[in-house]
């Protein structure tokens, strides 16, 4: 059961807090055999330089090893529990296969404890089941989609997201993403049936800056508030407008200026996002 709670304004930090509570989530510790140490990088690379700004601090986390390949074919797995995962917006499910192996998978919406899932070439079209796009009926809602066969799911993994299979053309399937983009994917790539869980994730409101800090996100300082040595907009006597068109700390135009290179997979886009 999902509960959306708005905190009472007992303090400025509680006034705007909106929390989403799922009473069906496991409250204990994660399964020890599928947990790895996650070292805090604080936005630094291997030479110690900051390569991603505004990262650092936050609560210590452990990484849950999630199975995105779903390559254990034709063996039924029973859902033992649904868990919270601090590393992603979706919930995860701990499943126990008939041969005794346990794995974490991204939990789809509607998957509950004691339900069964299975993956394979020809399995039932049911929530949580994984199969090649070749064998999925048109119009089916899917998630956790591979971009290359046997590489593991790379698309549609965030909370509440889904795509729809709208066509099949020679060796390719055509899927429609939430953004309106139409994309071709090889028919041999696998996908999972259903919508990703925790669709209420976007209703959360952290309420205060400290909640961002708990998540390892540091403040974003405006360029005009800095000194000239730190930013092209810095300096000046009193408040200034920056004196030029908006740029990044490295002098590259921002606010609409395109810097992204085309990906090789862009050639598979049939229709651009709206």
From Swiss-Prot:
GO MF, one example: structural constituent of ribosome
Assembly, per entry: Part of the 50S ribosomal subunit. Forms a bridge to the 30S subunit in the 70S ribosome.
Family: Belongs to the universal ribosomal protein uL2 family.
Protein name: Large ribosomal subunit protein uL2
Pfam families: Ribosomal_L2 (PF00181), Ribosomal_L2_C (PF03947)
Signal peptide: none
Disordered as annotated region, ranges: 224-274
Gene of this entry: rplB
Biased composition (Basic residues): 257-274
Function: One of the primary rRNA binding proteins. Required for association of the 30S and 50S subunits to form the 70S ribosome, for tRNA binding and peptide bond formation. It has been suggested to have peptidyltransferase activity; this is somewhat controversial. Makes several contacts with the 16S rRNA in the 70S ribosome.
PROSITE patterns (UniProt xref): RIBOSOMAL_L2
Organism for this UniProt entry: Francisella tularensis subsp. mediasiatica (strain FSC147)
GO-annotated cellular components: large ribosomal subunit
SUPFAM superfamilies: Nucleic acid-binding proteins (SSF50249), Translation proteins SH3-like domain (SSF50104)
Paired cysteines (S-S): none
GO annotation (BP), single: cytoplasmic translation
């Amino acid at each position: 059961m999902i509960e959306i709670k708005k905190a009472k304004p007992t303090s400025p930090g509680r006034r705007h807090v909106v929390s989403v509570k799922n009473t069906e989530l496991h409250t204990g510790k994660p399964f020890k055999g599928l947990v790895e140490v996650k070292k805090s990088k604080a936005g630094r690379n291997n030479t110690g330089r900051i390569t991603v700004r505004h990262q650092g601090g936050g609560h210590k986390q452990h990484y849950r090893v999630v199975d995105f390949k779903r390559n254990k074919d034709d063996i039924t797995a029973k859902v033992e529990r649904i868990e919270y995962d601090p590393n992603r917006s979706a919930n995860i499910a701990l499943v126990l296969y008939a041969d005794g192996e346990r794995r974490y998978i991204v939990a789809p919406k509607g998957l509950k404890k004691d339900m069964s899932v299975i993956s394979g070439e020809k399995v039932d079209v049911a929530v949580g089941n994984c199969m090649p796009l070749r064998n999925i009926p048109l119009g089916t809602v899917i998630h956790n989609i591979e971009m290359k066969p046997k590489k593991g799911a790379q698309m549609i993994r965030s909370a509440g997201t889904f795509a729809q299979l709208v066509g099949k053309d020679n060796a390719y399937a055509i899927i429609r993403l939430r953004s309106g983009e139409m994309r071709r994917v090889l028919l041999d790539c696998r996908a999972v049936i259903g919508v990703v869980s925790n669709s209420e994730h976007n209703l959360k409101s952290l309420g205060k800056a400290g909640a961002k800090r708990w998540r390892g996100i540091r403040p974003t300082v405006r360029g005009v508030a800095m000194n000239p040595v730190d930013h092209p907009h810095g300096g000046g006597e009193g408040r200034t407008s920056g004196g030029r068109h908006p740029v990044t700390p490295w002098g590259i135009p921002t606010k609409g200026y395109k810097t992204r290179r085309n990906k090789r997979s862009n050639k598979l886009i049939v229709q651009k996002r709206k």
